[in-house]
Amino acid sequence: MFKKSLVAVAVLGAVAFSAQAADVQLYGRIDTGVRYTNIDADVANQDDVSKFEMSSGNYTGNRFGLKATEDLGNGMKVGFVLENGFNSDDGALKTTNKLFDREANLFVTSDFGTLSAGRVGILNGTAGSYAIGNFNPFGTGWGDVGNQSLLWGAGFDSRYDNMLTYVTPDFSGFKVYAQYSFGENGHENKSSTNRYAALGATYTVGGLNVIGIVDTINKKSYDSTTKTTSDVDDTYRVTVGGSYDFGMVKPFVAVGYFKDGKIGDLLGTWAAEANHKANLDRYYDGYGLTLGASMPAFAGTAHAMVGYMDAEYASEANGTVTSGRQIDVTRFVLGAGYEYPLSKRTLVYADLGYFKDEVDAADAAKDKFD
């Protein structure tokens, strides 16, 4: 085992050295707009919370990056991607203490497929070199509007460190993808870190695109900060969907199932305003459905989606199960958007979203929350 580890390090080192001779491309995107949000907590004697603000990354995440590929001959190529995320409204890094937070990967491509190592986006998303989760017109972009993660995100991060990714060659439109993360730095592949794994496949022929992904979070069993054991169940998720481009319209349909997943951390600032936040911080089993479509309209493109989620209480945030506790969360999501290109590189857009959670909760004392 020790010799195999040394061989792997030597190969990656050679790839990094060779990639320095490649032509390096600088690229980026910037997205700034204004956003109005209204939150009704549905609590007696509590006013709605409204906010009008300048914001960045409403349509697509702001980024700049470096990437390069070098042809080594005999069908083999090496390359890298280094991509930073930032806020265009205040200039701050999107992620504290990470320069290339969106992606930092080194890859080798040959007739046997592509092997990548580093920080990359997960398969079940729409950001990164190997993301295949285009399950609705909005994907995981457009901020909270139409975001499919609201339906089956289940507490998965959009990216993980120390990730190995393998992609097979294209077999008549069919591809298989696999990912495994060793966990965060300093705790790689130890019981004190969460580890992500995924297996996915796509089939693309003509206008048809079919996607299937199974992924999981292998939860840590030891907390190195508190020096205590952890008994939180692993999270599992299965997502299947597809789309077909008819030219005049492109419909999307998808369904996702999750087990022992978190739903509260999907809402960002929305959860902080919700009167049922304590319920959303627990773990749930559930499913989500989405229907959507994109179509050309007035020299631009219009998008629309509708989504529904139903989840039932599985355990507390620490993994324990409270006897007699019954919580059911239903979620309804609507999204509409329009983008209009001013040139090959510049576009304007507008979107409108609606989101509603209903929580029916009862413990042994029959307490109710709406």
Task: Explain the meaning of each model-derived region.
Residues 22-36, 51-185, 193-209:
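Outer membrane beta-barrel
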Residues 1-23:
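Gram-negative bacterial Sec-dependent N-terminal signal peptides
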Residues 198-335:
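Detector for outer-membrane/organellar transmembrane beta-barrel domains
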Residues 34-42, 86-92, 123-125, 184-188, ...:
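Gram-negative outer-membrane beta-barrel proteins
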Residues 368-370:
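Outer-membrane beta-barrel "beta-signal"
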Residues 16, 52-56, 94, 152-154, ...:
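Outer-membrane beta-barrel proteins
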Residues 10, 65-67, 105-109, 165-167, ...:
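Outer-membrane beta-barrel architecture
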Residues 76-78, 112-116, 173-176, 207-212, ...:
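Repeated loop/turn-to-beta-strand initiation elements of outer-membrane beta-barrel proteins
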